[in-house]
Amino acid sequence: SRGLGDVYKRQASIQRALARFKKHHSDLKDLPNKVVFQMNDTHPTVAVAELMRILVDEEHLSWDDAWDITTRCVAYTNHTIMAEALEKWPIEIFQRLLPRVYQIVDEINRRFVMQINERYPGNEDKVRKMAILYDGQVKMANMAIVAGYSVNGVAKLHTEILKNQELHDFYEMFPEKFNNKTNGITQRRFLAHANPLLADWATKKVGAGWITDLTMLSKLKAYADSPVAQQEFAEIKRANKVRLAKYIKEHNGIDVNPDSIFDVQVKSCLLYTSPSPRD
């Protein structure tokens, strides 16, 4: 399955990174100074357990030393507040497919639940919300938060919702981990490379410095009311639509009218990201 294939890829990535590290360094305690595994959403979270497995089983470190290294080597980016987008595995399947990795997860969970009970004695609701293993499921997001030295959202509002609502219990316990990193795009890829006609037009207006200093594009405001600049901009937009229509015809055999409105989503179509109909 795709899910299991993804797990094997994460394991291979961890193994390769450690092999490369050991070529140049002898002390694994130096790993956090050289390597960070950024878990981009919950799908790569098995990296936590795989790194622990290698450090304990293959490098023969104590659990405490391995955990100290791991928790300084992994960080977690949360992309959504929607529960269905946070990966969960049925314990039965996870245990059968990855028996040793599951044992590691089980021990991480056991120790963390002890922490919860020390902090909130007798509060089963906290355990229910925060445990990695609960109600027959492996909750990958919980493992990412427990292990990661950093937990970030991708917009200010998103991060505040995580802290105050969706992940509030974790924020209450680990406030120092939470921070915001606003998502964005790079003008080098999405303008200079992807839209050469518009990139050339911008360079003619404000110079080439915008390629490395995005703030320079604000100088284009001076042309906002210029009929000539507006016409040039419109011509570039239409030329790009004609180019896309030609590509669609050549690759998909579909005729597209370049004078129609193009509503394009460059994104994988998943249940929680599929575009909704426009009015």
Give a label for each model feature.
Residues Q38-E50, C73-T77, N240-N252, V266-S274:
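Core structural elements
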Residues S1-R2, D6-V36, G184-K221, I236-A239:
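Function-dense linear segments that define catalytic or interfacial modules
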